[in-house]
């Protein structure tokens, strides 16, 4: 599982012009782009949620758990793109939707159980993600 985390001042995801998830302008939040590969499972989703919740990338070395920062979770299979050959990425390392969707849901649910204010995009949809990156701070997590 890979999660590309961006510290944001605000973010939102829309599908067909409708906002489906949002971090409203405030102090700080986290946008989590989540990619799933073939050997990921529920235990890995739980560990990744704990890692993100405790990651100290907010102001004053605080974590989302320390300050209750909101988290916007968006599925992103392209995190497993391979560009080693040719000019067109391959997606063989990305898990198929039937495997990935429940694990992205499990990741978001685990964050919620930890106390996070979580919003999500729509799995498999053509989404538009807008954000104001704060810092910028962008970190790639991988388990």
From Swiss-Prot:
EC assignment: 3.1.1.96
Main location (coarse class): cytoplasm
Pfam families: Tyr_Deacylase
One GO process term, biological-process aspect: D-amino acid catabolic process
Keywords per UniProt: Cytoplasm, Hydrolase, RNA-binding, tRNA-binding
Top-level enzyme category: hydrolase
Localization, UniProt: Cytoplasm
Example of a GO MF term: Gly-tRNA(Ala) deacylase activity
Matching InterPro entries: Daa-tRNA_deacyls_DTD (IPR003732), DTD-like_sf (IPR023509)
Catalysis performed (reactions): glycyl-tRNA(Ala) + H2O = tRNA(Ala) + glycine + H(+); a D-aminoacyl-tRNA + H2O = a tRNA + a D-alpha-amino acid + H(+)
GO cellular component: cytoplasm
Position of sequence motif Gly-cisPro motif, important for rejection of L-amino acids: 135-136
Keyword Transmembrane helix on entry: no
Keyword RNA-binding: yes
Subunit structure: Homodimer.
The protein's role, per its UniProt record: An aminoacyl-tRNA editing enzyme that deacylates mischarged D-aminoacyl-tRNAs. Also deacylates mischarged glycyl-tRNA(Ala), protecting cells against glycine mischarging by AlaRS. Acts via tRNA-based rather than protein-based catalysis; rejects L-amino acids rather than detecting D-amino acids in the active site. By recycling D-aminoacyl-tRNA to D-amino acids and free tRNA molecules, this enzyme counteracts the toxicity associated with the formation of D-aminoacyl-tRNA entities in vivo and helps enforce protein L-homochirality.
Domain notes: A Gly-cisPro motif from one monomer fits into the active site of the other monomer to allow specific chiral rejection of L-amino acids.
Similarity remark: Belongs to the DTD family.
Protein name (record): D-aminoacyl-tRNA deacylase
């Amino acid at each position: 599982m890979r999660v590309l985390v961006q510290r944001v001042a605000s973010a939102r995801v829309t599908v067909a012009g409708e906002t489906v998830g949002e971090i409203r302008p405030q102090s700080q939040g986290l946008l989590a782009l989540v990619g799933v590969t073939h050997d990921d499972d529920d235990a890995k989703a739980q560990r990744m949620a704990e890692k993100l919740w405790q990651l100290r990338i907010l102001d004053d070395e605080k974590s989302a758990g320390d300050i209750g920062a909101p988290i916007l979770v968006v599925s992103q299979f392209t995190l497993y793109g391979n560009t080693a050959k040719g000019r067109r990425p391959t997606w063989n390392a990305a898990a198929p939707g039937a495997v990935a969707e429940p694990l992205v849901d499990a990741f978001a649910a685990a964050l919620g159980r930890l106390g996070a204010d979580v919003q999500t995009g729509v799995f498999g949809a053509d989404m538009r993600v807008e954000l104001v990156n704060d810092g910028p701070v962008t970190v790639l997590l991988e388990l």
